[in-house]
Amino acid sequence: MIADRRTGAVLSLNARTRIGVVAGCALVLLAACGEPAQSASAAASTSAVSAPAHGSSAPKDSVPRTDAAPPPITYVPHPDTLRGLYVNRWAALGNSMWKLIDIAKRTEINALVIDVKDDRGLVLYKSRVPLAQKIGADSNRPMSQRRLAALFDSLRANNIYPIARIVVAKDPLLAGQKLEWAIKRRADGKPWLDKNGHPWLDPTQPAVWQYAIDLAREAHDVGFSEVQFDYVRFPDDDRMVREASFPLAHGRTRAQVIHDQLGAVRDSLKSDKMPMTIDVFGLTATDTTDMGIGQRWEMFIDRADVVLPMVYPSHFAPGTYGLGSPNAHPYTTIDRVLKDMKRRTTGLKNAAAIVPWYQDFTLGPPAYGAAQVRAQIKAGYDNGFYSWILWNPGSKYHTDALEAQ
């Protein structure tokens, strides 16, 4: 079993993998708030992704590369040690955005990971990417141009490093409108649906990744210093393995597909001079299989500049590392998983930097507060991991866990 990182709802995992997640209650999401739409940024310029072996060409909806030089953009430089917070779409659109910037001004926080495309497929601002416009991804209360400019003015003024989070495969909006890009059922060729009744994009489709590339380039043109790709995987659902068909896999394993696609994305973005980073399950450091989702440590660790494992103690089952409740032992759990990461990475060529995601939310007992958050951070420091990012699905954090600036 494994828990969905956004809601905390427990999901099933491939039967071979039993390190999964303890069952728990769903976390509360923020209510929608925002501003009316205006034009967002200078046009994103892209080139088609280099299709991996056995792949097909990029879609017609990708943005054409132009020769016109974009206006100069001042990018916030990468901090020597990154300490960040996740900012969901609704927090970015509301007053919470300014509160989170204020937290960064007062504490050790120096980076914000902001949803540019969330796991519903919604884009934060009015997009110049034709496909985003066509499917209405940017039409649900997008951030206004004025607010977007004010946001980046504030981030630059306070030297806060902005990271654009772009969800790749979990996009029910696009999968529902581009059925040819959705995962299909083997039995009848209709879209495969997860347990919530939502379709997923097929990770074997190069067009799926091209859309993410187009949005990444646009985010960079808007002013984001870095792009972070999430859901770079197959669905974590036993039924998918039994029911779904992937014609473009051409005999490749799920892990090989993810390896190939990440490599193609990285090659495509090299000329854009922005770091490529990916989120992965924290369990990948300990589990030696791909867990049914296509994420196997040795096959993705050299496919990005930075890998961000989600090492939430609540996501480790009772008995893992000999702990009756890993969630009740945040220091020990993080200490053990980070040691596994170091062991799995030692000796590998071109391995990415590792920046762990830590848990600042409650999923099962005990309730998490400043002490539990700080225990995770200390475990990281004791293992030589000095950069980190905190995750709370509602973007509400225990500021007393953060050191003053």
Predicted regions and their residues:
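Bacterial signal peptide processing site
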Residues: C33-P36
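Active-site-adjacent "subsite" loops/lids of carbohydrate-active enzymes
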Residues: Y75-N88, A92, D153, A169-D221
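Catalytic domains of carbohydrate-active enzymes, especially glycoside hydrolases
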Residues: W98-L122, D221-E226, R303-V306, G380-S387
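Aromatic-lined carbohydrate-binding/catalytic grooves of carbohydrate-active enzymes
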Residues: I109-M143, D236, R242, L402
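Glycine-rich, aromatic-flanked loop segments that form ligand/cofactor-binding clefts
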Residues: N110-V116, S144-L193, Q228-F229
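Aromatic- and acidic-residue-enriched segments that line the glycan-binding/catalytic groove
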Residues: L124-I135, D171-D194, P235-A249, Q295, ...
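Aromatic-lined carbohydrate-recognition surfaces of secreted/lumenal glycan-active proteins
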Residues: I163-D171, Q228, R254-I293, K349-T362
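Substrate-binding cleft of secreted/luminal carbohydrate-active enzymes
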Residues: A304-P318, N327-Q405
